[in-house]
């Protein structure tokens, strides 16, 4: 029996916090108009194509080292709530979906864990023909996987690593290896015993830092060349504290 040919067209993959997935036509989607089942909400949207792949990173008591995949072309469309991702993949016992990414086979992701290690992998490296996925990342039992970050191929791309104690380290993306077979990866940032890596970003010239300021108010600050200079170093260094924040929580690429 011949395989059903998928028409290559733009879609937006919509994923809910409780793991319901759907693919809506086009890329002109207003996320504010999306509706979900009672008690559910938006996890994220991914502008991709019907020939691309949806990756699901699972979590369990043994760490989030297993990756599952399904073809975007198999996802339901229309106006409904979609389909639970658990009907498309077979999660290992005790595991739950933790993070998602939908994109082309050639795209590269930065995968990092709270223990401070990380690696680069192409989407094609993470795809499995088995519904049970594949073991890809080596994580300690107490370590968790951070949300995967799209790594742009720009020569000047930089990596930002933010620790729980508010230290920020910035270094060239070229200092991280592409590891097609997975593993533990390289040390991204040097962490003290009680510290952890809480956020990573791949960016060009400027970086958003989000968190709480003095007095507990939500704060967001854009760091450009002058503000970033003190934090630039080599991979596996400790980085420097970020001024002006009571608790920096996230770093995000600008633009």
Which stretches of residues belong to each language-model region?
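Short, structured "edge-of-domain" segments at secondary-structure transitions
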Residues: 1-255
């Amino acid at each position: 029996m011949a395989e059903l040919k998928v028409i290559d067209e733009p879609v937006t993959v919509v994923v809910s916090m409780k793991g319901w997935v759907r693919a809506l036509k086009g890329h002109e989607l207003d996320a504010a108009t999306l509706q979900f089942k009672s008690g559910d909400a938006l996890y994220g949207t991914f502008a991709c194509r019907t020939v691309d792949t949806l990756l699901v990173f699972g979590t369990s008591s043994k760490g989030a080292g297993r990756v599952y995949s399904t073809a975007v072309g198999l996802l339901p469309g229309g106006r409904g709530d979609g389909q639970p991702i658990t009907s498309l993949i077979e999660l290992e016992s005790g595991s739950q979906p933790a993070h998602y990414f939908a994109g082309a086979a050639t795209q590269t992701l930065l995968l990092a864990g709270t223990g401070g290690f990380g690696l680069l992998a192409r989407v094609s490296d993470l795809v499995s023909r088995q519904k049970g996925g594949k073991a890809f990342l080596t994580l300690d039992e107490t370590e968790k996987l951070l949300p995967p970050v799209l790594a742009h191929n720009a020569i000047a791309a930089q990596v930002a690593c933010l620790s729980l104690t508010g230290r920020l380290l910035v270094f060239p993306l070229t200092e991280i290896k592409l590891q097609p077979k997975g593993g533990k990866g390289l040390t991204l940032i040097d962490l003290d015993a009680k510290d952890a890596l809480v956020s990573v970003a791949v960016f060009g010239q400027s970086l958003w830092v989000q968190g709480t300021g003095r007095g507990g108010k939500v704060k967001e600050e854009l760091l450009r060349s002058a503000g970033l200079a003190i934090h630039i170093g080599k991979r596996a260094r400790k980085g420097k504290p970020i001024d002006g924040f009571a608790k920096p929580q996230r770093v995000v690429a600008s633009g």
